[in-house]
């Protein structure tokens, strides 16, 4: 779905005036944009058949819409200029994996791991990219390769050479007794680039490669014997990534429109998709302001900051307007103050993805009464994505994400001591957010290509530059 905000007057005015004044002012804002899932895509059969059957044709059509010499696009220029007079990263090409994009007639069956599929079953370990750590050959598992995702190993963890990311994932799964589901065929490819896409298949691969549950449990038992030390360590981690600063970032960019409630929300003569696009366009301008308030983000190299913002903007915007909409009945509340009702979304042909936002995000957030500190931590986890393509130091980003995990866990234990499973429930919203974000991004590209929906300048520029989906 799309995000929330007002339409930007003129790109020249907005980008030069707004960003040069506010982005240097250490403010921060991000919202989460979710675009529309089409229920009636058959209305464009010819176009769909010719242009949307594969990544090559999509790229060709998109590139043809870009102005010459503008390969990097406005988001790079605006974000980079707001962070300092540094050189911009080299432009990259929109390079989807070597397979066909999911057919648009199955958009409603979105999967968080549908982009790339290996041969059925874990036999995919025998593929060329996995031969370095094939099956039962200990010699093949070098100390430099993670047996789960192929990233650089940091040592042997729970019986298997693995990276810090897979080690932490396996430990959290066992300690929190998390149960995952695969939205696809339980045969998702797990590699460095997309290890976070399907938690079920990642966990199954951890087990298949030999990670031992009992090793985590034994480690936990030992840690209980050192509870004082652990408490001190947790306190130290919370100080490194203070939840107060994360909350401040959320409040600093809060559009302050909750007062509308369910009654008295402004109506609009525009269709829902147009309203959402306009709202998303405005919220994108506050993305940098929010991110710069998140601890340690501004300490990363400029190029990495740009990559992380561009890799996560859609999920960040979606999370924001979903949380903002918990008090709305059967609809979402945009940052512009406009209310988009479920019925109008269905009439506009975007009912399917709209319903997913309501049931998988808004409803869940409402049921658990998710507060803004928890929302901010989840969005910070999305922001610090070590799998974003092109990072100069993915390990550093991974470490920052782990700090946010620790901060969120500590916060939930202190604030909600009677809800021991709350931390796990919060983390389980991330796969749904990723899945919905990817599908909304596909629909945003579709709306852009068919030209039926006005997408404001900044959002259009964002789409015309390569987007790192990893």
From Swiss-Prot:
Gene Ontology terms for molecular function: nuclear receptor activity; nuclear steroid receptor activity; nuclear thyroid hormone receptor binding; protein heterodimerization activity; retinoic acid-responsive element binding; sequence-specific DNA binding; zinc ion binding
DNA-binding region: 146-211
Record region (Modulating): 1-145
BP terms from Gene Ontology: cell differentiation; nervous system development; positive regulation of transcription by RNA polymerase II; retinoic acid receptor signaling pathway
Region spans: Hinge: 212-235
Stretches for region Disordered: 217-242
Assigned GO CC terms: RNA polymerase II transcription regulator complex
SMART domains on file: HOLI, ZnF_C4
Biased composition (Basic and acidic residues): 217-229
Annotated keywords: DNA-binding, Metal-binding, Nucleus, Receptor, Transcription, Transcription regulation, Zinc, Zinc-finger
PROSITE patterns to which the protein is assigned, alphabetical: NR_LBD (PS51843), NUCLEAR_REC_DBD_1 (PS00031), NUCLEAR_REC_DBD_2 (PS51030)
Keyword Nucleus on entry: yes
NR LBD domain mapped to chain residues: 238-466
Zn-finger segments (NR C4-type): 146-166, 182-206
Gene3D superfamilies, A to Z: Erythroid Transcription Factor GATA-1, subunit A, Retinoid X Receptor
Superkingdom of origin: Eukaryota
Principal place of residence: nucleus
Entry's family note: Belongs to the nuclear hormone receptor family. NR2 subfamily.
Subunit structure: Homodimer. Heterodimer; with a rar molecule. Binds DNA preferentially as a rar/rxr heterodimer.
Function field: Receptor for retinoic acid. Retinoic acid receptors bind as heterodimers to their target response elements in response to their ligands, all-trans or 9-cis retinoic acid, and regulate gene expression in various biological processes. The rar/rxr heterodimers bind to the retinoic acid response elements (RARE) composed of tandem 5'-AGGTCA-3' sites known as DR1-DR5. The high affinity ligand for rxrs is 9-cis retinoic acid.
Domain note: Composed of three domains: a modulating N-terminal domain, a DNA-binding domain and a C-terminal ligand-binding domain.
Name of the protein this chain belongs to: Retinoic acid receptor RXR-gamma
Organism field: Xenopus laevis
Lineage: Eukaryota, Metazoa, Chordata, Craniata, Vertebrata
Protein's gene: rxrg
């Amino acid at each position: 779905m799309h995000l929330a905000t007002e339409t930007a007057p003129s790109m020249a005015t907005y980008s030069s005036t707004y960003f040069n004044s506010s982005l240097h002012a250490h403010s921060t804002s991000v919202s989460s944009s979710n675009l529309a899932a089409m229920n009636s895509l058959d209305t464009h059969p010819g176009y769909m058949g010719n242009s949307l059957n594969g990544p090559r044709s999509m790229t060709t059509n998109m590139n043809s819409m870009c102005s010459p010499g503008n390969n990097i696009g406005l988001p790079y220029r605006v974000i980079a200029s707001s962070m300092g007079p540094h050189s911009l990263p080299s432009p990259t090409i929109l390079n989807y994996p070597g397979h066909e994009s999911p057919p648009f007639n199955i958009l409603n069956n979105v999967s968080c791991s549908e982009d790339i599929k290996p041969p059925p079953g874990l036999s995919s370990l025998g593929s060329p990219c996995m031969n370095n750590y094939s099956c039962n050959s200990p010699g093949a598992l070098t100390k430099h390769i993670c047996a789960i995702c192929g990233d650089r190993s940091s040592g042997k963890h729970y019986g298997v050479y693995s990276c810090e990311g897979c080690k932490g994932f396996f430990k959290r799964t066992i300690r929190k007794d998390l149960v995952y589901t695969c939205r696809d065929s339980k045969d998702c490819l797990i590699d460095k680039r997309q290890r976070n896409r399907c938690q079920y298949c990642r966990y199954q691969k951890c087990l298949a490669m030999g990670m031992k549950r009992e090793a985590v449990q034994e480690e936990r038992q030992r840690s209980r014997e050192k509870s004082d030390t652990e408490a001190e360590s947790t306190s130290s981690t919370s100080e490194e990534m203070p939840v107060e600063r994360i909350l401040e970032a959320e409040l600093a960019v809060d559009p302050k429109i909750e007062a509308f409630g369910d009654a008295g929300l402004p109506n609009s003569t525009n269709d829902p998709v147009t309203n959402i696009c306009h709202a998303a366009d405005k919220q994108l301008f506050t993305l940098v302001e929010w991110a710069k308030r998140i601890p340690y983000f501004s300490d990363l190299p400029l190029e990495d900051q740009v990559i992380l913002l561009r890799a996560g903007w859609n999920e960040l915007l979606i999370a924001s307007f979903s949380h903002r909409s918990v008090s709305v009945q059967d609809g979402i509340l945009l940052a512009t103050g406009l209310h988009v009702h479920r019925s109008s979304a269905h009439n506009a042909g975007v009912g399917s993805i709209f319903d997913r936002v309501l049931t998988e995000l808004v409803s869940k957030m409402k049921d658990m009464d998710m507060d803004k500190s928890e929302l901010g931590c989840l969005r910070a986890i999305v922001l610090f994505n070590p799998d974003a393509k092109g990072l100069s130091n993915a390990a550093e980003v991974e470490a920052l994400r782990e700090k946010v995990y620790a901060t969120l866990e500590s916060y939930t234990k202190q604030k909600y001591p009677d809800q021991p499973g709350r931390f796990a429930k919060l983390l389980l919203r991330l796969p749904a957010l990723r899945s919905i974000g990817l599908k909304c991004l596909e629909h945003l590209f579709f709306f852009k290509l068919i030209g039926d929906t006005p997408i404001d300048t900044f959002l259009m520029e964002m789409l015309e530059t390569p987007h790192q989906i990893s």
